Amino acid sequence: MKNKFSLFCVLIMIFTISCTERFVIPSDIDSDNSGQFGAGDTTFLQISPLWDRAFDLDQPEEISIAQDGRIFVADKGNNSIVVLDQNGNRPGGFEGLRNLTDLNQDEISPIDVDVDKKMNVFFIDGSQRIFMWNQYWNESGINKISTSATFRHIQTGADTMAIAGTDLWLSLLNDSDWGIIEGVMDSDQALIDSLMKPHLFYDGNDEMNVYLDTYYESDKSQFTGLTAPADNENMVFVTDSYGGLNNQYRIVQINFKRSLILELESGDLVWSYVGQFGGTVKGFGTGAGTVNQPLSIDVDYQGNLYYTQAGDYFPIHMIYPNLSGDFAIYTSGFQPEADEVMDPSWFTNALDIALDENKNMYVVDNVNSDVTVFDSKGDYFKKAGYGQDSLKLMIEPCALAVDQRGVVYVCDRANGSIYRYQLSNSLDEDITPED
């Protein structure tokens, strides 16, 4: 069935989109933390129970916490994104993230996952691809999808008709000089099903991305880390560790581009996006704020990027954007010998970094089997995960995340488990330390 929508509907759509991006954190999540670590902060205690195979985990590789507190785990062993609440229960509605496959029905083994404010769940598999699944679309259901539209140039008044999916359509849809005055939507069930399922968001093999990525080989990228800004920024960042003759070690910005208009079962009109190469944020080097064999990445609420790497000479970096020009220029926020977080002696193999809501940094080391914690200024605070700070030894911790309560979640790929820790002086009454 087809129907037309007008410019008035598009204006309503713009309002609707702004509303659907709102994300309310449940009231039962305790976020009354003091901020910086203090002298009274004592020991990281392990929380019971250990989340293991009884919680449907097999080989957890990465972990992310959505703004509603739900926990998303990239589980390479069972080709799934495992979703848990803060009690370890499996909420309904996320069955589409299990047993992941691509368009060729080949299994997808996710190695990283993140969730943005629009309820987009992004994940990567170590290739040049980024996949996505939208929670809101699946909760609401998709009724119709745009198939064509008539666009009008704002200054000249010229009209142009475009078919959805064509180069002309994508160009006009993303050009602020053109607006939709009339469109046609259709309930194409095959297309609806493809959007409801996990699907390809970005592909380095795409001709446009190869063209835009002038100095590197976009089609050979090997994404090792992924992060999505917490607010309304229409972009994600990935670390590329392909290497090769051109030292393709870098951080890449992927921009959102409008691709379709969706009418949900609720009547809301929302955009569907595809990813397009936006630029190399930082490239290869061995000094502060450069990239060499990157492993993971995270972003704070100010847009500062934090990443770990295996190459020379510093395992941990933070870069911050200067937005005064036409495009962001990133500069190192930490310096060797001045900031303890850049001292390589703290780490043997720093695999992942995560931030809490106060920009304190948590770094997991799979060789040392521990977590090293630094405050937002880069000063050392404490170790967690071994010795006096833990009653159980992690075997091969590989990733971590921190929720609004300050609970630290650590993936251990060797025993298919997630360990949880919290400072002993900030334990909630409903959290039980390990006996």
Predicted regions, residues:
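Sec-dependent signal peptide recognition
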Residues: 3-10
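C-terminal motif of bacterial Sec signal peptides marking the signal peptidase cleavage site
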Residues: 15-18
